[in-house]
Amino acid sequence: MNLNRRQFITSTAAASTGLLLTSLTSFAKPIMPDSQSGYSLLIFATNWGFTGSWDEFASKIKQAGYDGMEVWWPTDEKNRAELLEVLNKHKLQVGFLVGSGEKDFQKHLAQFQQNLSAAAKAKPVYINCHSGKDFFSFDQSKQFMDYTEKINKETGVPIYHETHRGRILFAATIARQFIEKVPGLRLTLDISHWCNVHESYLSDQEETVSLALRRTDHIHARIGHPEGPQVSDPRAPEWSDAVKAHFSWWDKVVETKRKEGKRITFLTEFGPADYMPTLPYTRQAVANQWDINVHMMEVLRKRYA
């Protein structure tokens, strides 16, 4: 019985390794146009779920091969000074997240504007906006975009609005309205949210997705599916359709940047429990968040460098 059990474990591990290697090799580097002068790829790490210090996080991502980190703009002066010191020490770049949790429109807008203006003064590589709420009106929402365009012109810092559930651009149909009416709108594409919102891989909204891809300058490289914003493990073969769909969208964005000689930035953003599926009763994550994000970084680097 023990021998059979050991044989089962050994054969299962071997089979799993084979499936994993198959899933990795199925995403060989695509044929891309020669990159024009100015094209560059930067990949950032998320501190979402990390419980150590800024210095510990910076050291870990530097060793893993990241170019920098994307983190929420620290409103506390001491925390901010520590972060900026660590970035300089480890020679890492930074993108800042800004937003607000206020439900009242006027309070939300005021807090958003304050945080955005402060973050822009620090001259990050970019600012990613969790803009507004999904229940704000079109006219209210447009005020966020008008303000970000103003700050972009004043500071030169690229500012993007994320396609995120609960925010202004929570759905493809809503985002299209803003894309068509706000010429200066630039996007952080986290299309995993739209897969979840529309319960599909968006095959019935190809024109809308194409419009969004053309406005994208920054990508959150998390893979979603029709029933959730994050697959359990993108290396697992059962998620191959989801992985292929997301890479097909990202390929198009990168192809455009290569042709235009422009920069593309990525954030590997697989989240911790409970964003990652967990086991019942224990809330134990079913996969290792850090390992998945590093895997994604390595695949992106190989594919798009």
Specify the residue positions occupied by each region the protein language model found.
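Histidine-acidic metal/acid-base catalytic patches
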Residues: 11-13, 29-36, 55, 181-186, ...
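Aromatic/hydrophobic pocket-lining residues that form the small-molecule binding cavity
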Residues: 54, 80, 108-112, 141-145, ...
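Short glycine-rich, flexible loops that bind phosphorylated cofactors or substrates
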Residues: 78, 136, 228
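Acidic (Asp/Glu)-rich catalytic clusters
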Residues: 34, 58-63, 77-95, 111-123, ...
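Active-site beta-loop-alpha junctions enriched in small/polar residues
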Residues: 44-49, 72-74, 99-103, 132-134, ...
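N-terminal pre-domain/capping segments
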Residues: 2-114, 287, 294-305
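Hydrophobic faces of well-ordered beta-strands that scaffold small-molecule active sites
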Residues: 37-46, 69-71, 94-99, 127-129, ...
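Active-site acidic/histidine proton-transfer and metal-coordination neighborhood
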Residues: 14, 21, 104-186
